[in-house]
């Protein structure tokens, strides 16, 4: 099916990896990293822009570990940690509402258009975006309904940095990537030329969009415009990685649920994977679940399945009942985000995966 996706121009390049009961049962690499002559065949070492998978591979596990360490309480109000985030209903927003998208905050804003060009991808740009986020007024009463929002994860990243006094990408490396041996799951910090050079050295990146705003083809810098304005490291986007390392992080979540020897406390994973009780919500704390009817996870995954999608054409689904992890990484936004045929391709692929490895 992946080769059919290439032939049908769903994406120029992609990787599919499936793990069952702790072992890799399928790993395949298809197409090219780019359509231009600089493109090379996709391989196990190809690094993809993971987009919103950042939420479940970096931000959410960092929040869980902060809770595990006793440094955060999910019922604490965000304004207690971010004093500027007050008034107009903001005071009622608890950390768990940022995680399960029930804060009422807007889905997304074009903040990058309001950052002075000289501040883009600098510490000043990060500060400017954060100020605009804290000025947002909830569009619904906090805790009343689910409204998917990148803004909540911008705030969660800021809160983590406030609590620990360290950049979130450093926390990610020290608490997650290094302990798990994940050398190919990383951020490209555009605020620091030295750090970004280290992140890029020796790595092959799948190209994303020929960006009209930036006026160039994006290869090794974050696709999401707001994250770019913030310097490449965001709570909502910015992570790059290979299919193997994305699957390994998924395995860390699953192992923590199934054993008492995981990186995360079992009871906290159970709490984070508990589906919201809000009517119509498919969310847990940080994660999504397959929606009823036409789901991007297709048909066949178990009722406890959790995961997430990424705008660039990425997804991760974890089915605890069959101990199955399915990773799909593509660069479907190359050369343009206007190609949305992955919305038809992805459910069919995941249905086939579920049928291939039944419970």
Segments predicted by a language model, with ranges:
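Short, surface-exposed loop or secondary-structure junction motifs
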Residues: 30-34, 88-303
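Short, conserved catalytic-motif segment at the N-terminal edge
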Residues: 1-50, 71-73, 135, 224
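Catalytic tyrosine of NAD(P)H-dependent dehydrogenase/reductases that use a Tyr as the general acid/base
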Residues: 48-51, 146-148
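Generic C-terminus detector
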Residues: 334-358
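Short, glycine/proline-biased beta-turn/loop segments that scaffold the active-site neighborhood
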Residues: 73-88, 179-180
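Short, surface-exposed beta-strand/loop micro-motifs that present aromatic residues
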Residues: 312-325
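Short, P/G- and charge-enriched loop/turn segments at secondary-structure junctions
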Residues: 3-5, 47, 142, 301-306, ...
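Active-site SXXK
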Residues: 2-3, 16, 22, 49-75, ...
